[in-house]
């Protein structure tokens, strides 16, 4: 656990992080610009918020269940191979592209990014979504029957929110952007 061990710099370069049995890595608030976890295939928890990461390759980390990468400088993040992912936080980055694909994912916080779109169609267990302050014109939550928390305001660009008929409870608990129209599928 290197959480808040200020000044670690780039200690996590490939030659330094050879931990094939490591399942939890916390390295928040360390000003890291690179983090190579490719030699850690057993990681289930990765918390690396409040760093300076511009990229993060998770190709070899298919067991991750809890991923926290907020407050970095990430522009793209492919988490589509993380089929065991349950909670995911990537807020306050510079993301323009985000790929998710986990039947177990229940919690997504991706607010304050530059996302143009977000595909939620393969996230049937999604319970909470915070996606405000992005650049979507449309968002489709009609394939997310478990969704109970949906936060998309403010987002001036949002014009259409697609929902299913059974999601009326969301309208009671969420504040939609003024210009957005709700369309039932």
Question: How would you describe each model-predicted region?
Answer:
Residues 1-12:
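Single conserved hydrophobic/aromatic residue that forms the stacking wall/gate
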Residues 3-4, 35, 71:
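Serine/threonine-rich, low-complexity intrinsically disordered segments
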Residues 4, 18-19, 28, 39, ...:
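C-terminal capping segment of individual leucine-rich repeats
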Residues 6, 23-27, 44-48, 65-69, ...:
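Conserved hydrophobic beta-strand positions in leucine-rich repeat
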Residues 141-185:
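Leucine-rich solenoid repeat scaffolds
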């Amino acid at each position: 656990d290197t959480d808040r061990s200020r000044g670690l710099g780039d200690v996590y370069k490939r030659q330094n992080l050879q931990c094939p049995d490591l399942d939890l890595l916390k390295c928040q608030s360390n000003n890291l610009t690179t983090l190579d976890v490719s030699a850690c295939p057993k990681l289930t928890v990765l918390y690396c918020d409040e760093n300076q990461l511009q990229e993060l390759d998770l190709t070899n980390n298919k067991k991750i269940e809890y991923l926290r990468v907020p407050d970095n400088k990430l522009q793209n993040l492919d988490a589509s191979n993380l089929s065991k992912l349950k909670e995911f936080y990537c807020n306050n980055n510079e993301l323009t592209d985000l790929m998710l694909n986990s039947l177990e994912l229940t919690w997504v916080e991706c607010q304050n990014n530059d996302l143009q779109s977000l595909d939620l169609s393969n996230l049937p267990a999604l319970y909470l979504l915070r996606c405000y302050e992005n650049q979507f014109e449309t968002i489709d939550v009609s394939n997310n029957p478990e969704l109970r928390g949906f936060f998309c305001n403010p987002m001036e660009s949002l014009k259409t929110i697609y929902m299913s008929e059974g999601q009326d409870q969301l309208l009671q608990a969420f504040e939609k952007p003024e210009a957005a129209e709700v369309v039932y599928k």
